[in-house]
């Protein structure tokens, strides 16, 4: 399962309205919990600016703890993501969402845990079809 920034923000912040639904998806998943470096960067910024450095450090330590599949994105993945950004440029999706599409292909999954239904209802898997967007 590919996990987007919005879902991780809800997971790590119990005050978020979707915290329980996202937590259930993560805590009950038998799939790898795949997180891109771009999602980590977005999450780090949001937590640091909204909540503070202590929360930021707690999130980073949790992500580094081994339960999460921290995916690598090299030049080939960035090039592939750039093609996706080009294809969907009217949607203004950005590198984080495009990398999630690339990683979904690499990990052979169509399941995306996100609260960003607008983008992921428009985006398509590289191999065709549709993503399964949860929660």
Curated annotation (Swiss-Prot):
<protein>
    <recommendedName>
        <fullName>Ribonuclease VapC26</fullName>
        <ecNumber>3.1.-.-</ecNumber>
    </recommendedName>
</protein>
<feature type="binding site">
    <location>
        <position position="97"/>
    </location>
    <ligand>
        <name>Mg(2+)</name>
    </ligand>
</feature>
<feature type="binding site">
    <location>
        <position position="4"/>
    </location>
    <ligand>
        <name>Mg(2+)</name>
    </ligand>
</feature>
<dbReference type="InterPro" id="IPR002716">
    <property type="entry name" value="PIN_dom"/>
</dbReference>
<comment type="similarity">
    <text>Belongs to the PINc/VapC protein family.</text>
</comment>
<comment type="function">
    <text>Toxic component of a type II toxin-antitoxin (TA) system. An RNase. Upon expression in M.smegmatis inhibits colony formation. Its toxic effect is neutralized by coexpression with cognate antitoxin VapB26.</text>
</comment>
<dbReference type="InterPro" id="IPR022907">
    <property type="entry name" value="VapC_family"/>
</dbReference>
<keyword id="KW-0378">Hydrolase</keyword>
<keyword id="KW-0540">Nuclease</keyword>
<dbReference type="Pfam" id="PF01850">
    <property type="entry name" value="PIN"/>
</dbReference>
<dbReference type="GO" id="GO:0000287">
    <property type="term" value="F:magnesium ion binding"/>
</dbReference>
<dbReference type="GO" id="GO:0004540">
    <property type="term" value="F:RNA nuclease activity"/>
</dbReference>
<dbReference type="GO" id="GO:0045926">
    <property type="term" value="P:negative regulation of growth"/>
</dbReference>
<feature type="domain" description="PINc">
    <location>
        <begin position="1"/>
        <end position="118"/>
    </location>
</feature>
<keyword id="KW-0479">Metal-binding</keyword>
<dbReference type="InterPro" id="IPR029060">
    <property type="entry name" value="PIN-like_dom_sf"/>
</dbReference>
<keyword id="KW-1277">Toxin-antitoxin system</keyword>
<keyword id="KW-0460">Magnesium</keyword>
